């Protein structure tokens, strides 16, 4: 069990004051989007190195149909985790209708980012990338978590979803790490954003999707679901779900 870390930021008040018209512009002078600088060496990376970053507004890109999770026992586990983490977070999270759970025990080719509706019990699942530092061989499986700056790895634990901002990949969502294993999220620029290297066709063809630098990267269409249903003071939890 991770402990929540008090970072001394009243994020709830900040979000309440700043979330107007459903979107927030970036704070000036602060760019938290990722920049891919490492040389591309694998066959997969060479094939998709030239993929253009989408310039279309997120709202104009249609999401792929979410993939439901049919395993009743797994569904119950997700709901139990969502309830547990909401209870652990308490007043730090001020929108508890939907909880995002990223299950990094699954391959990146599988829809493993689960949006749990706490009111209806409906669970919708999407593709999400993990960090390249968590998967150096790029075989599609997360090997380790890290909270260390420069690791380019995914961090486990509970996050508070914050405001929207404009970055390299367009509209993105800031994240505040609330655990001892992810408290560097803001400093590491760990965010949620769309990316051209996350796509169902890539997963089907290669058995994996691309890697981020630690961010929760989604396909452009799926990311619309995150913008409207997971941002603005909700809970995101990342771990290996057994």
Predicted feature locations:
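N-terminal secretory signal peptides and thylakoid transit peptides that target proteins
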Residues: 2-22
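Boundary at the C-terminal end of the N-terminal hydrophobic targeting segment
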Residues: 31-33
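Glycine-rich, aromatic-bearing surface loops/beta-hairpins
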Residues: 35-37
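Cell wall/extracellular polymer interaction/catalysis modules
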Residues: 39-212, 220-224, 228
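Short cysteine clusters
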Residues: 215
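A short beta-strand-loop micro-motif that forms or neighbors metal/cofactor-
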Residues: 229-242
